[in-house]
């Protein structure tokens, strides 16, 4: 029973590891895939592009500040990797280039990525440490659980930061509203007094 449960959990873990996408890239356009990645995580990717004579595709991986982490021109099939230095939204862009005189056709692009615990080779770890297959699976699940816990901690931290920002914004809006009302009341009072003096000067009122 325990082994069956472990195998089921392992299969669920494998289902969550590795992300693969496939799309068609229109000539002379670019498509970017973006994802939030924690700090100090290894990202490994593998890509393949359908071959069309006279057309080329470049790829570039960068962060929100525009720092280039990986780049390759005229790609067909290959791999890339980079390390995330800080928590940020990282993007991988594929750029199609077709000569002006050529009528381009869409190219098919496939991309498979892994990050963090997904990049570990547990088979190699098992062989080096002389672990049994069941122990390797347990090690995989342990690392995956730690990764999920870190993700939840980070999400909770970001939630608290957003809540604090929201509360500060609400306080500023309330202060600005009160200040605006005080200004309007002061202006209205000044107008009433001014008109009262004006009408008295014109002897329209006593």
From Swiss-Prot:
An annotated Gene Ontology molecular function: cargo receptor activity
- Topological domains on the Cytoplasmic side lie at 194-206
Q: Where is the signal peptide?
A: 1-20
According to its UniProt entry, the function of this protein is described as:
Eca and bai are essential, though not redundant, for dorsoventral patterning of the embryo. Specifically required during early embryogenesis for the activity of maternal tkv, while the zygotic tkv is not affected.
**Spans through the membrane:** 173-193
Q: What is this protein called?
A: Transmembrane emp24 domain-containing protein bai
Where does the record say this protein resides?
Membrane
Main location group: membrane
How is this protein situated with respect to the membrane?
Answer: Single-pass type I membrane protein
Chain ranges sitting on the Lumenal side read 21-172
**InterPro entries to which the protein is assigned, alphabetical:** Emp24-like, GOLD_dom
Q: Which PROSITE patterns match?
A: GOLD
Question: Which SMART domains did the record assign?
Answer: EMP24_GP25L
List each copy of the GOLD domain by range. 30-140
Alphabetical GO CC annotations of the entry are: cytoplasm; membrane
Keyword field? Developmental protein, Membrane, Signal, Transmembrane, Transmembrane helix
Give the UniProt family note.
Belongs to the EMP24/GP25L family.
Q: Which processes are annotated in GO (biological process)?
A: dorsal/ventral pattern formation; endoplasmic reticulum to Golgi vesicle-mediated transport
Record the organism.
Answer: Drosophila ananassae (Fruit fly)
């Amino acid at each position: 029973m325990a082994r069956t449960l472990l195998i089921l959990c392992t299969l669920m873990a494998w289902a969550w590891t590795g992300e693969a996408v496939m799309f068609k890239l229109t000539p002379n356009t670019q498509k970017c895939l973006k994802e939030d990645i924690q700090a100090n995580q290894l990202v490994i990717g593998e890509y393949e592009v359908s071959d069309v004579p006279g057309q080329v595709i470049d790829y570039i991986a960068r962060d929100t500040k525009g720092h280039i982490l990986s780049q390759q021109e005229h790609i067909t099939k290959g791999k890339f990797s980079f390390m995330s230095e800080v928590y940020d939204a990282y993007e991988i862009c594929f750029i199609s280039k077709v000569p002006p005189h050529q009528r381009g056709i869409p190219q098919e692009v496939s991309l498979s990525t892994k990050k963090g615990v997904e990049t570990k080779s547990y088979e190699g770890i098992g062989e080096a440490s002389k672990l049994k297959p069941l122990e390797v699976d347990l090690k995989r699940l342990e690392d995956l659980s730690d990764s999920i816990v870190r993700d939840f901690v980070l999400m909770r931290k970001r939630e608290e930061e957003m809540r604090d920002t929201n509360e500060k914004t609400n306080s500023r809006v309330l202060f600005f509203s009160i200040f605006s009302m005080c200004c309007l009341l002061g202006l209205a009072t000044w107008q009433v007094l001014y008109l009262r003096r004006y009408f008295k000067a014109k002897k329209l009122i006593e």
